[in-house]
């Protein structure tokens, strides 16, 4: 008897802008899901595929089995090998042991947390508790409310406490990781040179775009004293993609589960908080639409910070590090995204949008009057 797929027909995913697009990575099929779950002796019989994720960088589906719901996620092996997923899964296991509300990662009969089949790598999670209130929302879209921003700050602080003691080294070179080797360097331009040189597809893409001059200009504008600020922040493994769509929510508007650790790496708490603000306090998808001076929401950023401080104090040095990083905190992941578009997908237009609109455009906004006002308001409200 065929396994029903209730959402596979006409499946679309989020594009780089506001429009939905045909997926780069096709939806997982019932036959494919069955082949993956055959590696997990604890898996029960599949009843139906209920939902396919609209996220563009991988494919994922919620599967109804006779013993509950599972999430099966597929990655192209050029993006995540089994070893790359194991880096994430070891961090998640540490967080779970410390009491953090994270997904339960299933292991195969051989004890592995990922399965490699053909050109793909798969992971299987038990469906985590909580409502996926933001699952259809694009990245860089704000919280629904200041209460959600505050709750997200509380949850982030608790996650950072759970992360303490996890001493794994930084992740291996691979696409779509928010690593922390450029901003933390005493010479960020030299670190950027090394980053690009280690990624041939990225280097080839950037070759015609005067990238050294343009990055040097950004570091000159925003990098002074940055390494000194960061040097005082304790290293910590962090989530690095703190957006409400990566949180499952309880009925009382608190965070029930934290998921999607794909961008996680060793950085510091200030870096993770800066990313959280960059992801949630700006309507970046409206940038260039004629009202750039109105895309920022300092109240949301301050609510996030207040929630964090309800659990963990933010001293003046940490707060200054967060503010100093904000104009550049996206740079390393933007380069990683360009590497993905150039080296894995072969989508030059998306790569150009990531370079011009994301990496350069977001940083340039902070140099505008509205951007400088936003940073000044954070400082003033924090009495720095």
Named regions from a protein language model:
Residues 29-39, 168, 191-239, 381:
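An alpha-helical support segment within catalytic cores of ATP-dependent transferases
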Residues 270-312, 327-346:
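Active-site activation/catalytic loop segments of kinase-like enzymes and analogous catalytic loops
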Residues 56-66, 71-72, 105, 220-271:
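Active-site acidic catalytic loop and adjacent metal/ATP-binding pocket
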Residues 125-141, 195-200, 331-347:
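A glycine-centered beta->alpha junction motif in the catalytic cores
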Residues 2-47:
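Juxta-kinase regulatory segment immediately upstream of eukaryotic protein kinase catalytic domains
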Residues 21, 332-384:
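ATP/Mg2+ or Mg2+-diphosphate-binding catalytic cores
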Residues 66-167:
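ATP-binding pocket architecture of kinase catalytic cores
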Residues 12, 142-207, 235:
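A cross-family kinase active-site recognition segment
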């Amino acid at each position: 008897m065929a396994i029903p797929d209730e959402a596979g027909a006409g499946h679309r995913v989020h594009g780089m802008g506001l429009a939905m697009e045909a997926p780069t990575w096709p939806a997982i099929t019932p036959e494919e899901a069955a082949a993956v779950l055959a590696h997990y002796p604890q898996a029960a019989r599949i009843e139906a595929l209920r939902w396919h994720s609209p996220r563009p960088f991988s494919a994922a589906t919620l599967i109804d089995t006779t013993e509950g719901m599972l999430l099966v996620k597929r990655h192209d092996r050029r993006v995540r090998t089994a070893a790359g997923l194991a880096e994430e899964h070891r961090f998640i296991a540490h967080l779970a042991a410390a009491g953090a509300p994270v997904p339960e990662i299933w292991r195969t009969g051989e004890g592995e947390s990922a399965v490699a089949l053909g050109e793909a790598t798969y992971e299987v999670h038990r469906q985590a508790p909580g409502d996926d209130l933001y699952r259809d929302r694009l990245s860089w879209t704000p919280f629904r409310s200041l209460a959600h921003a505050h709750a997200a700050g509380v949850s982030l602080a608790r996650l950072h406490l759970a992360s303490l003691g996890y001493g794994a080294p930084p992740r291996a070179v691979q696409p779509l990781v928010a690593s922390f080797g450029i901003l933390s360097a005493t010479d960020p331009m030299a670190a950027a040179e090394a980053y690009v040189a280690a990624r041939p597809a990225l280097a080839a893409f950037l070759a015609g775009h005067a990238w050294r001059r343009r990055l040097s200009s950004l570091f000159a504008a925003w990098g002074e004293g940055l390494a000194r600020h960061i040097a005082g922040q304790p290293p910590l493994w962090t989530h690095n993609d703190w957006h409400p769509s990566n949180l499952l929510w309880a009925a009382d508007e608190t965070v029930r589960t934290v998921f999607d650790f794909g961008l996680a790496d060793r950085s510091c708490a200030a870096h993770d908080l800066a990313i959280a603000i960059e992801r949630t306090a700006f309507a970046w998808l409206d940038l260039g639409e004629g009202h750039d001076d109105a895309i920022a929401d300092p109240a949301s950023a301050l609510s996030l910070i207040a929630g964090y401080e309800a659990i963990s104090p933010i001293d003046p040095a940490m707060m200054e590090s967060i503010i100093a990083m904000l104009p550049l905190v996206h740079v390393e992941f933007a380069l990683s995204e360009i590497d993905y578009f150039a080296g894995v997908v072969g989508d030059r237009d998306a790569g150009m949008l990531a370079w011009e609109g994301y990496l350069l455009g977001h940083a340039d906004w902070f140099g505008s009057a509205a951007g400088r006002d936003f940073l000044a308001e954070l400082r003033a409200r924090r009495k720095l």
